[in-house]
Amino acid sequence: FHPSLWVLIPQYIQLIRKILKSG
């Protein structure tokens, strides 16, 4: 994996959690 992926993946997880909570 590229180092950037390890930074992007956690950010996407946080966004998904926010969407699930708001939903």
From Swiss-Prot:
Name assigned to this protein: Conolysin-Mt1
An annotated GO cellular component: extracellular region
Plastid is among the record's keywords: no
Modification Serine amide, positions: 22
Tissue: Expressed by the venom duct.
Location relative to the cell: Secreted
Keywords: Amidation, Antibiotic, Antimicrobial, Cytolysis, Hemolysis, Secreted, Toxin
Reported function: This cytolytic peptide has ability to disrupt the integrity of cell membranes from both prokaryotes and eukaryotes. It permeabilizes both negatively charged prokaryotic (PE:PG) and zwitterionic eukaryotic (PC:cholesterol) model membranes. It has potent hemolytic activity on human erythrocytes and exhibits low antimicrobial activity against the Gram-negative bacterium E.coli (MIC>50 uM) and the Gram-positive bacterium S.aureus (MIC=25-50 uM). Intracranial injection causes mice to shuffle backward until the encounter an obstacle, at which time the mouse jump into the air.
Additional remarks: The mature peptide does not contain cysteine residue. Mt1 and Mt2 peptides are found in a ratio of 1:4. Mt1 is more active when intracranially injected.
Highest taxon in the source lineage: Eukaryota
GO molecular function terms attached to this record: toxin activity
